[in-house]
Amino acid sequence: MHGAPRLTFPCASEYLWHAREKAYQDHRRKVQSAQPLVDTRAPLTFRHLHLKLKRLKLEEERLSVIERDNRLLLEKVASVMRTRGQTDSKNNSKHRRK
């Protein structure tokens, strides 16, 4: 027990002292075995609030556009590789000065 030191018989009679001591011991036992009353768990989460369907749909559309652009670029690169990338870089016309 902690607190101030207790006198042997602070009451007028020994019977009252035992009754108060028993009540105090019962109180200490209840305090020791007390369970917390505050709920410290995380609040309930709802999946439909965390799963952003609109965001997933927009992401899927964005990825499909990227895939389509990549496929078109790949076709262009393959076409250049097949035709050996021949371009008309020779210019036979004369430059005119103004």
Curated annotation (Swiss-Prot):
Pfam families to which the protein is assigned, alphabetical: Hmw_CFAP97
InterPro entries in the cross-refs: CFAP97D1/2 (IPR038792), Hmw/CFAP97 (IPR029488)
Family the entry assigns: Belongs to the CFAP97 family.
Full protein name: Uncharacterized protein CFAP97D2
Organism: Homo sapiens
